[in-house]
């Protein structure tokens, strides 16, 4: 089995972002913003592990493994943008968080299928 280093590296950097986000949530935010930021940090952390897993699954995952990684990445970007924007003084992004959540769910489905179909 050959790992995909790009997915592993991306997952590691998303994990770094999760730690930074958790630190930001713990320091200096009002309670509501801190809860929102902590939720974003938690999503980053769990999905960092998922992206690393996609990379380690490597060639065994086939094209569905890459689809899962892409869905995790795009879903995180949308979800976290919607969570963090209002807590940092930006606009509310409406349905962006649910769209990101749906993409994350689709990523998990693609990842599971990549295992079942191999």
Where are these regions (language model features)?
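Polytopic transmembrane helical bundles with strong interfacial aromatic enrichment
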Residues: 1-118
């Amino acid at each position: 089995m050959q790992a995909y280093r790009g997915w592993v590296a991306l997952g590691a950097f998303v994990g770094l972002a999760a730690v930074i986000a958790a630190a930001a949530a713990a320091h200096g935010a009002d309670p509501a913003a801190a809860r929102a930021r902590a939720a974003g940090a938690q999503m980053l952390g769990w999905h960092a592990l998922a992206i690393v897993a996609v990379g380690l699954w490597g060639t065994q995952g086939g094209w569905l493994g890459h689809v899962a990684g892409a869905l995790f990445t795009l879903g995180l970007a949308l979800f976290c943008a919607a969570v963090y924007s209002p807590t940092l003084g930006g606009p509310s992004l409406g349905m962006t968080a649910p769209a990101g959540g749906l993409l994350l769910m689709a990523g998990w489905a693609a990842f599971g299928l990549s295992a079942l179909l191999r």
